[in-house]
Structure formats: C-alpha cells, structure tokens
Amino acid sequence: MSKQNKQPLLQRPAVVGVLASLLSIVVGLVLGFVLLVLLNPGAAVGGMRAMLATGFSSMDKLGKVLYQAAPLMMCGLSVGFAFKTGLFNIGASGQYTMGAFFSLLCAIQFQLPWYVCLLAAAIGGAIWGIFPGLFKAYFNVNEVITSIMFNWIGMYLVNLLLANMPNMLASGWGASNSDRTAALNVANPGAILPRGPFAALFGNSSWINISIIITIIFAILVWVILQKTTFGYELKACGLSRDAAQYAGINSKRNIVLSMVISGALSGIGGGIYYLAGTGQYVLEKSILGMGFNGIPVALLASSNPIGTIFSALFISYIQVGGAAMQPAYSSETIDIVIAVIIYLAAFALLMRGVIAKAVSGRKEKGGAAK
C-alpha cells in the first residue's frame, strides 16, 4: 500500500483543499446573511433564499449562470496559472480588455469567423502579458506594479483606437451610439459564438453558447500542462525558487516571460468569449473592467487548481445571478455589497486550510496523549 493511501483522509492535500473552499463559502454566506439582516431584517430570509435558489429556478437562469461563468473561469485560470508559477498577475483586466479589442477588431473590421477572432483574443492578451513578464525577468520590477499600470494603459489605448476607427463603432453601422462597438448581429453574425447543443436544451431566450465548453477544455489543458509536463514542472520550479531553478539549469527568465504570456492569453480569451457572445457591446470605458479582478477570488477559492476553477467560477456566477433577484427588497448597491462580501470572504480558502490543519493536528495530539 502506498504512503498516500496510508495518509489520513483529513490530511490529504486534495481533501483539505476542498474542505477549505467549502468552509470559506459557508463563512461568506453567513456573513452575507448577517449583512442582509442589518440592512433590512424583514427581507433577509427571503433575500438569501432568492440568491441561493434563482440560478436553478429556470433553464433560462441556469443558462445565464453558465454564460457568465465562462469569462470568469478564463480570468480565474489566468490568475491561478500565474500564482502557480510564483507570479501575481493583477493585470488580468488589461489583458482581458486587449483580448476583447483584438477579437472585436477581427470580427467587425476584418469580418472574420468566430474561431479566428478567438485566436486573436488570445494573441491580444498574450501581447499585454509579455510586458510585465519582461520587466520582471530582466529588471526584477515587481509584476504587480507593472501589470496595474498596463491595466490603465490598455483601457485608454483601446478607447483611443476605437474613437479613431469609425467602422468599429455602432454609429458606423446605422445606430445612434458612438460610445460603443457595433452589435455583432448587425456587423458580422458569423463572428458570434455558436450555441451548439445548448440551443435545443435552453431555448432561444438563453444567452448560453459553446464558451462554457471551451473554458472547461482550457481548464483541463492547463491542469495537464502544470501537472503532467516537464514544461509545467519548470514553470512551477521557477515560481518556488528562482535561484534553485537556475542552479538546476532551468532558464528562469524565459519561464517568467512565458508564464505571463500564457496567463495573459487566458485572460484575453476571456475577453473574447464575453464579447463574441453577441449579447453585449464594448463601451468606451472610464474605469477598468472588473472581470479581470473577479478572476482573483475565483483563483483563490479554487486554491489556484485549474479544475477547481471550474467550480469556483460557477459558484460566483451563480451568486451574481441570484443577487439580481433580491430586488426590490434591497437596492442594487446593497446587493453589490453583499455579493462582494460573499465572494471575497469565500476566497479565503488559504486561511481556512490553516484552520483545518490546526484542528486536525490538535485532534491528533489529543489522540496521542490519550494513548
């Protein structure tokens, strides 16, 4: 019998990780409920019930959960991949924005099909990820600082480019709006992600498309790269100890840059699949898109595990869809605060790991003393 099999169940890393995530979710929900009670005691139970039940109340709502989970999952994979390689990619929002721009550029300006647009989204995100990687690898500049800067640079650059490309804007396709890109169903229906098998299952009213399948495939692919390949081992080795990796003959500078490029590409795909759904238009922004930042709690809740990211993204999407059903008992601002509390407290999985480990070790010591 292997050593892994002899190890007590509650001491196995995989089991502890799952328990930590579940405990974090419970704590987040409890504190969210307390906040609802403080704000409107009479509606707290009904509000929490609506939040937890709405996602399964109809096929349309379930489809919306899956639709919103797809870009969240890609951003979570992006942040989690960087975490696994010892980097903190807080620039996922900028990479997401560049991915959205590249995909829409191919869709509207060049009239290309959806799969080419999605590839362009990955390239856009990768390009925006390479700069923080280069600064980190060759000048040892903290990637948090550079990636935050590139979030803002990316947003304003996209605004500038779109403002000077009339054919990209809705006003260039007969609409009155000049502050957003053209609707894909007007400009290029062939660039909209197909609905595949979901059309018959969820009906025409649902927004769901094959993006959820694409993101699950990417999650599995990232897991295989990190866990089953030499390349993934080298990336993680650089993250654990750059000096030790160099001593072992691993090119740490190259791997740091590649880590940020891959992480950026994943965020870029997230931006691509969101806007290629055909349900929204990119609006010239005055603040950074929040989707990239939402990838951080997705990754933390999953302990940066690519497979766990699938479930954490689904949970966060489910809470967001359910939160909309809490009106009119609660204002939209209140709902946003409650959802934020639940999501960010649910991301304390690492802290909960320590709590579980301490509880298990304490029980083990008591058992040993009793003997």
How would you name each of these model-derived features?
Residues 1-25, 240, 247, 251-254, ...:
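Cytosolic-side transmembrane-helix boundaries in multi-pass membrane proteins
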Residues 20-37, 72-79, 100, 104-106, ...:
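Hydrophobic core segments of alpha-helical transmembrane domains in multi-pass membrane transport
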Residues 127, 194, 202-281, 306-307, ...:
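Helix-loop-helix "hairpin" substructures at the membrane interface of multi-pass membrane proteins
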Residues 54, 59, 151-226, 334, ...:
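Transmembrane helix-bundle core of multi-pass membrane transporters
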Residues 36-41, 53-109, 122, 126-141, ...:
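Single transmembrane alpha-helix segments in multi-pass membrane proteins
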Residues 2-74:
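Membrane-interfacial amphipathic/re-entrant helices at transmembrane-helix boundaries
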Residues 7-19, 83-91, 110, 122-188, ...:
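Short loop segments and helix-boundary regions at transmembrane helix junctions
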Residues 261-340:
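Transmembrane alpha-helical segments in multi-pass inner-membrane proteins
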